[in-house]
């Protein structure tokens, strides 16, 4: 494995030959291995009241961290009330193809599957188990954004919060920092006057 046989480019827009099904680690001999998460990470998760899955590449940033031993068990702990996915504003090669891009539900399913693999389980995860890993989903809505089926997610116990973003020169939507912070505050239980003010500004945030 000292010679690189795989060429990878995130800038390449061509569809992958097939959808990514699974991510795993290998040792120098090409054998699959299961790595333990950093103890400091597990300690932080044990004390956390909220987890935020931030914007980024699903299979080259998020999933490799979730499949580490101990992470899935820590995230699935019911004492963590808020497990918030900030959904990407666009799909990329990892979540294609262009003809059938990932929906929000498929992002959630991939996260749940990674969490289950961290715990030693293989195969797909039952849909009713998704909320053990994701309880809330913040998203944009517009051309090019992943499809969000609010009713379907709500039936699984996952709350959705729509945020209005900014149209960039390249044509894609980006999260507005103020609106995103506002959505996180509302999601994590900031009620009263702040919530009323947030929900009344329909040009910024819609639940």
Q: Each PLM stretch: what is its role?
A:
Residues 1-52, 57-207:
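Conserved catalytic alpha/beta core of Sir2/sirtuin-type deacylases, generalized to analogous enzyme cores
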């Amino acid at each position: 494995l000292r010679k690189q046989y795989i060429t990878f480019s995130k800038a390449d827009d061509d569809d992958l030959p097939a959808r990514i099904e699974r991510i795993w680690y290998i040792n120098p001999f090409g054998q699959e291995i299961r790595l333990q998460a950093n103890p400091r990470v597990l300690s932080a998760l044990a004390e956390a009241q909220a987890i935020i899955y931030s914007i980024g590449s699903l299979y080259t940033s998020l999933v490799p961290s979730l499949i580490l031993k101990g992470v899935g068990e820590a995230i699935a702990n019911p004492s963590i009330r808020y497990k918030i996915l900030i959904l990407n504003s666009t799909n990329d090669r990892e979540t294609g193809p262009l003809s059938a891009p990932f929906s929000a539900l498929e992002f959630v399913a991939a996260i749940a599957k990674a969490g289950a693999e961290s715990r030693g389980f293989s195969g797909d995860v039952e849909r009713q188990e998704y909320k053990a890993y994701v309880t809330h989903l913040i998203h944009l809505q517009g051309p090019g954004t992943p499809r969000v089926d609010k009713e379907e997610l709500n039936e699984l116990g996952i709350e959705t919060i729509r945020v209005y973003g900014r149209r960039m020169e390249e044509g894609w939507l980006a999260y507005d920092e103020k609106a995103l912070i506002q959505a996180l505050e509302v999601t994590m239980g900031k009620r009263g006057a702040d919530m009323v003010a947030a929900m009344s500004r329909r040009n910024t945030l819609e639940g």
